Amino acid sequence: MNLKTKYKTKIVPLLQKEFGFSSVMQVPKIEKIVINMGVGDATKDAKLLELAQAELQAISGQKPVITKAHSSNASFKIRQGQAIGCKVTLRGEKMWNFLEKLINIALPRVRDFRGLSNRAFDARGNYTLGIKEQIIFPEIIYDNVKKIRGFDVTLVISSDNAKYNHRLLLELGMPLIKTKEHANG
């Protein structure tokens, strides 16, 4: 059973019953996943940005958009409009496929992995995690990697209640660290 089917058939009814939602539409759902890779060295060498784009495309299955600096900053030696990274926004089937790959394949390959933080929810209930090495994804061939590079993965969730969102991520199989506060979940 894939993750999307599990969400629709098992997780939605469970959360609806557990939190007393009157409608299925009240149950939190993942709207999109944004993967952002900052390439600070791109200011010196434009080829690094192309390599990062290719890696991000291999990981996500979608062509990344180049992100540019909003303002100049002399301490970072960047000018306004200069390319400094790339990002991908995944929705629909690609989003579910990426999430399944992240949970079942990539995160178990992280060295000394003890679980994801419970404190990574922002004020709007979105969950962000940092991946330190792109090589944990099977699409990246280690011998072709010029530089180990990390990126951020943000799960944008429809609800702004961190308690509901935490429970949703646990049910989806995210390896969140269990604390006393969330011990029953």
Swiss-Prot record:
This is one of the proteins that bind and probably mediate the attachment of the 5S RNA into the large ribosomal subunit, where it forms part of the central protuberance. In the 70S ribosome it contacts protein S13 of the 30S subunit (bridge B1b), connecting the 2 subunits; this bridge is implicated in subunit movement. Contacts the P site tRNA; the 5S rRNA and some of its associated proteins might help stabilize positioning of ribosome-bound tRNAs. Belongs to the universal ribosomal protein uL5 family. Part of the 50S ribosomal subunit; part of the 5S rRNA/L5/L18/L25 subcomplex. Contacts the 5S rRNA and the P site tRNA. Forms a bridge to the 30S subunit in the 70S ribosome. One of its GO terms (molecular function) is tRNA binding. It comes from Mycoplasmoides gallisepticum (strain R(low / passage 15 / clone 2)) (Mycoplasma gallisepticum). It comes from the Bacteria. One of its GO terms (biological process) is translation. The keyword Ribonucleoprotein applies. The gene is rplE. Keywords: Ribonucleoprotein, Ribosomal protein, RNA-binding, rRNA-binding, tRNA-binding. InterPro entries: Ribosomal_uL5, Ribosomal_uL5_bac-type, Ribosomal_uL5_C, Ribosomal_uL5_CS, Ribosomal_uL5_dom_sf, Ribosomal_uL5_N. PROSITE patterns: RIBOSOMAL_L5. It holds the Pfam family Ribosomal_L5_C. This is Large ribosomal subunit protein uL5. GO terms for cellular component: ribonucleoprotein complex; ribosome.
